[in-house]
Amino acid sequence: MQLLCVFCLVLLWEVGAASLSEVKLHLDIEGHASHYTIPWTELMAKVPGLSPEALWREANVTEDLASMLNRYKLIYKTSGTLGIALAEPVDIPAVSEGSMQVDASKVHPGVISGLNSPACMLSAPLEKQLFYYIGTMLPNTRPHSYVFYQLRCHLSYVALSINGDKFQYTGAMTSKFLMGTYKRVTEKGDEHVLSLIFGKTKDLPDLRGPFSYPSLTSAQSGDYSLVIVTTFVHYANFHNYFVPNLKDMFSRAVTMTAASYARYVLQKLVLLEMKGGCREPELDTETLTTMFEVSVAFFKVGHAVGETGNGCVDLRWLAKSFFELTVLKDIIGICYGATVKGMQSYGLERLAAVLMATVKMEELGHLTTEKQEYALRLATVGYPKAGVYSGLIGGATSVLLSAYNRHPLFQPLHTVMRETLFIGSHVVLRELRLNVTTQGPNLALYQLLSTALCSALEIGEVLRGLALGTESGLFSPCYLSLRFDLTRDKLLSMAPQEAMLDQAAVSNAVDGFLGRLSLEREDRDAWHLPAYKCVDRLDKVLMIIPLINVTFIISSDREVRGSALYEASTTYLSSSLFLSPVIMNKCSQGAVAGEPRQIPKIQNFTRTQKSCIFCGFALLSYDEKEGLETTTYITSQEVQNSILSSNYFDFDNLHVHYLLLTTNGTVMEIAGLYEERAHVVLAIILYFIAFALGIFLVHKIVMFFL
C-alpha cells in the first residue's frame, strides 16, 4: 500500500504579524481522501516547543527534483534483499498464576516475601526506566539526513571509541529498533559513516522521499529486517576492512533469546580479550561485528520488554537477562572502555536487593541449584542497591563450598556446576574491582576453594574449551584462584593431546589462559589477604593457601617474612620450593623468618574414617620436575574420607610428594599410609596360621600312632 501524505501549513495574518493558527491535513490513501484540521494551540500543548519554521525546513518540500535525484544516487542500495525463513522464539515466558505484580517505580521492602514467591514487573514503568534518556536517535547529519527525518526520543545507547576519536561506534536503541553507527576519520580528515538498523519492519523509522526500505534492506525474515544506511563512497571505504556475514548476524539476532544472545556475545568478548584484542583492538570484521552484536544484546532485552505492551514481565526472566547484560557491560568497559547509558532499571535493582535481604546468605549453598542461580543473579543485578557487600560474597562462598564438598576430587567441573559458579563469581569480581572488600574470611575461603578446584584435569578442560571456542573456556575457578605458578610450558604440558585439537589452537588457548591469569587484573590481586603485607615480591609467589589462623605462602625464594620457613630442597630437584606460614597474619620482624627448616617425613600416616582429624588442613602435591600440582582443602569428613579412600596418593611414583599443611603452621610430608585396622587384619592372619598349624600337628600326631 502506497501512502501519500501532504501537509498544508496555512498562515493567517493578524495585525501585520504572521502567526500559525491551525494545521490542515489532507490524507490520500489509495484514492480515499480524508481532511483534518488541528488547532495549533492544541498541537503545541501536546508537543511543547515545536517550531513551525523548523518543521518547514525539515520537511524540505521545496526541494527540486534534481537535488532529490542527486541525494538518491549518493545513498548505497543493496543488490537485493536476502529473504530467510527463521523461527522467532518466544522469549519472555508466561507469568505464573498468582504472581505478584510489581511497579518498577514503587518498590519497597516487603513488596515480595521471598525467593519462592512468583513475581513479575509491570512492563510500562519498566520500559520507561530502561529508556529514560532523551537524545537524538536520527541526527541531522549526512548520510542520515538524506534518508531520515530528525528524531529525538527516549533511548539507550552503547558508545565506544578506538584510536582516540578516530574510530567511534554508537549503538542507539529504542524499544522498537536499533541503529548501530560506525564513524571513522581517516588520516586526511575524511569522515566515513555506515549504519546498520535492526528491528521489526513495521516499526522502523519513516523515510524521506524518494527512499523505500526494500532498496536498503539486506536481510528480512517474517517481522524483522536488517538495513544498511550509508553512501556508495563510504560503503566502499568500509568494505576494505569490514565484510560482515549479514546472514549469520541477522539469523542469530532473530532466532536466539535475549539471554542466550547476550551469552553468545559475552563468550566472543572473553575469547577476544584472551587473545589480546582488548589491548590492541584491530579494525577488522570480527571486531566491528562484535561491536554491533553487543548493542543487539542490549536491544533484544529492551525490545522484549517493550513487546509485552501493558503486560507483566516474569522476574526470573529479568534476573537472567539483566545478569547477562551486567556481565556484558563489565567486560566491554574493561575491554573497550565502552559507555552504556540506559538499559538500567533502578526499580529492578531495588527489587533484587529487597529480595536478597530476605535470604540467609550463609545458607545459600543448601538451596537447589535453580534457586542458587536465581539468588546469585539477583545479587549481581541488585548489587548497586545492596548496601551491605560482605553478605553477598558470603552467599557466593556458601554456594562454592557446597559445590566443592560434592565435587569428585580432581575432576573438571561439569556443565551445570560450572554455570552456577560462573554466576556466583561475578558477585566476587564486582567487590574486587570496586575495592570494597574488607579483610574478611569469606573472600579468603572463596579463593582457597577456587585454588583447590584448579586441578590439572580442570585446566585441561578449560584449554580444550578455549581451543574449540566452547563455553567451558568461559569460566574456571582457576581465574579466581591463588595459583601463580602456571607458566606457558606448564600449561602446554597440561593441555589435552587429542587429534581433533589443532596445535595452533591449543597454543592460542594457552596464551589466552595466561592472559586471563595476568597479575595486572584486579581479580588476581591478593591485596585483601592480611598476609599480603609479608610479601615483598608477588612475582616470586607460586601459590597462597589461606587456612584458619595461618596463611601459607609458597614461593621460589625465601624473601617472605613469615612466622617460619620450610624448604623442600632435599627432594625438589628442578628449583627451590619454600613454604612460609604466616600465623595470625603476623609477619616476622626480620627480613626473613630465619634459616629454613627441613620438612619432616611421616612414613606411616594413619588412615582413619571415624572422625575428621584433618578438617581445616590442606594437602599440597608437587612433582620434582613439573613443580606444584594441586592443593586440596579438607572441609569435612566426607572430603577427608574421599581422599583417604581414593587413589589420591601415588607412593609408587617417587617423584611426586605430598605435604600436609596444618592450622598451627606445621608442614609434614606424607610418605606412606598406615591402615588403622591393620593390626586387626594381622591378628586374624596370625590366628588362621596358628589354627592351620594346630590342625597340621594334630594330623601328624594321629598319623604317628596309626
From Swiss-Prot:
Region of interest called Interaction with gL, as start-end residue ranges on this chain: 165-229
InterPro entries xref list: Herpes_gH, Herpes_glycoH_C, Herpes_glycoH_C_sf
Modification comment: N-glycosylated, O-glycosylated, and sialylated.
Membrane topology: Single-pass type I membrane protein
GO cellular component, as recorded: host cell endosome membrane; host cell plasma membrane; membrane; viral envelope; virion membrane
Membrane topology (Intravirion): 704-706
Function: The heterodimer glycoprotein H-glycoprotein L is required for the fusion of viral and plasma membranes leading to virus entry into the host cell. Following initial binding to host receptor, membrane fusion is mediated by the fusion machinery composed of gB and the heterodimer gH/gL. May also be involved in the fusion between the virion envelope and the outer nuclear membrane during virion morphogenesis. The heterodimer gH/gL targets also host EPHA2 to promote viral entry.
Family to which this protein belongs: Belongs to the herpesviridae glycoprotein H family.
Subunit structure: Interacts with glycoprotein L (gL); this interaction is necessary for the correct processing and cell surface expression of gH. The heterodimer gH/gL seems to interact with gB trimers during fusion. The heterodimer gH/gL interacts with host EPHA2 to facilitate virus internalization and fusion. Interacts with glycoprotein 42/BZLF2.
Name used for this protein in its record: Envelope glycoprotein H
Record organism: Epstein-Barr virus (strain AG876)
